[in-house]
């Protein structure tokens, strides 16, 4: 299971290909909720009908990287233009497009402890291994 989406009061769990494999009335700790995707219906054992099916490759890549670096994300948000924001409790991490996300997640593992208990947005959209450019905007 790669993640889940909320739909009509239930949680729809999907695999790496975006196929809905299970439904539940509650979320499962350790599996991120994916938000921001648009779809008009959900059918068990069929792919989620999203506009850009490639988003599931991004979701799988992101969840594997987060797991590899022991970063327990609560939600993964995709904006309409597929900009990624990771949500850890009350803190949001704006990652930007999924290009170079592995480099950003690698850097995030060292920054996340300092976000604990904070509300706001850590902006990593311009972050690279060379520039290490970030900013934090409290709520």
Q: Where are the language model's segments positioned?
A:
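Charged, solvent-exposed interaction patches on well-folded alpha/beta domains
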Residues: 1-139
């Amino acid at each position: 299971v790669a993640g889940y989406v909320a739909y009509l009061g239930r949680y729809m769990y999907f695999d790496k290909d975006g196929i809905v494999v299970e439904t539940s009335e509650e979320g499962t700790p350790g599996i991120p909720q994916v938000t921001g995707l648009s779809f008009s219906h959900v059918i068990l054992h069929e792919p989620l009908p999203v506009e850009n099916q490639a988003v599931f490759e991004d979701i799988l890549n992101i969840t594997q990287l987060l797991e590899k670096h022991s970063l327990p994300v609560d939600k993964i948000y995709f904006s309409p233009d597929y900009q990624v924001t990771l949500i850890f409790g009350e803190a949001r991490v704006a990652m930007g497009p999924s290009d170079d996300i592995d480099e950003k997640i690698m850097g995030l593992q060292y920054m996340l402890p300092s976000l604990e208990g904070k509300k706001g947005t850590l902006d990593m959209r311009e972050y690279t291994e060379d520039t290490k450019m970030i900013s934090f905007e409290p709520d």
